[in-house]
Amino acid sequence: MQSSLPLCREFFEKITAYLDYHDFRLTITANQPSITLPYYVDEKAHSIELIIFKTTFLSLFQEAHTYFNKTFSDQSGISNENIYYMTVGFLLTTPENKTVYNVHEDLLKRYFQDNSVLVIPDLLVKEVRLIQRLLCSSNNRINKSSSLWILYRKLFVLSLDANTLVLPDILFVFHSSGSQHFSNYYCWNTARWFYDNLPYNKRIELFNLTKRFCFQNVKDCSSWSALAYMVCQQEEKKTDNIRDFQRLTSSFNVPFKINKVDLNFQVQPADAFTQELVKWIDRTYAADWPPYLCLLQITKFNITLRIEMDSVLLTWRNEILNFEENSGHIKMINNTPIVPEKFSNDLLTSVNFAHFGYKKLFLNKFLDKNKKEQSDS
């Protein structure tokens, strides 16, 4: 049967092509007068970029929307494949449409139980690539769609089935999606979920990727918060993530035996990471708040670490006193160190004001937290 959704189907075929390419970029951009094709593929040696022009994007939405209305008014000529392509069009253009999202998920469930429901070769492999590539797109609404991130979790669960030869490339997705959009909460919150449910060897890989990302993106508070969580997991949140994973395996009838050793495996002891982070802050003269907040969050959930932090606190306090003696008092506005005007053209001193200012803020918050807990006890 010829597709009634040529744009939606072509988009699906384009975005799920090159299955062996992990570095696949989806870009939505303004029309280019020199290009008349609805989609443009920029093929490089090690990466692929699929470019969708604005006119195509709007036409694709109109095509999916028209077909959506038809499915409710006239059921004749409706095929599961066309419904699937319609939902793909909506996942691109309006990913938070819950009605369409539910239709899409229902089709996946039915297909997983009976492959004849959708006559699309290698559908689950293509579905995983589709969602991964949407999550790595240049479009903020797609990249930060909570519905797509939840669907990605479900596809991971489906991929665990013994009959499914597909494995989501989670490391590339988190790095690419996190790099595309600064402080992507849904991306790094999903990373927490994966971290709590991955086998220990994959957990190590995710932890190392997150740590590298943070050290390379010092201002990204969402990734630093995820890193703090991985180092010192909150038991309640961890339990919620594990229960959600178990709920999904049950929902999709995926047999999966929990490995308690995996669940309780700690990638890097909190004290070892804390020492590494403190050395990194000192060595790089970190002049942004997220690394300090990460350190603060880790000590919040580990009483032993607070005692071991005494020598660090003393060293930092002396550094701050020496700096203020030579350069003047560090003033803060809305928890941000202010560089005096006379040093505004002095890059080194300006960085030092930020560096020692955030150390001072850390000390104040650390001590305030301890005082509050002592008064509450």
From Swiss-Prot:
Keywords: Cell wall biogenesis/degradation. One of its GO terms (biological process) is endoplasmic reticulum to Golgi vesicle-mediated transport. GO terms for cellular component: cytoplasm; Rab-protein geranylgeranyltransferase complex. It comes from the Eukaryota. Present with 846 molecules/cell in log phase SD medium. PANTHER family: PROTEIN ECM9 (PTHR11129:SF8), PROTEIN FARNESYLTRANSFERASE ALPHA SUBUNIT/RAB GERANYLGERANYL TRANSFERASE ALPHA SUBUNIT (PTHR11129). This is Protein ECM9. It comes from Saccharomyces cerevisiae (strain ATCC 204508 / S288c). The gene is ECM9.
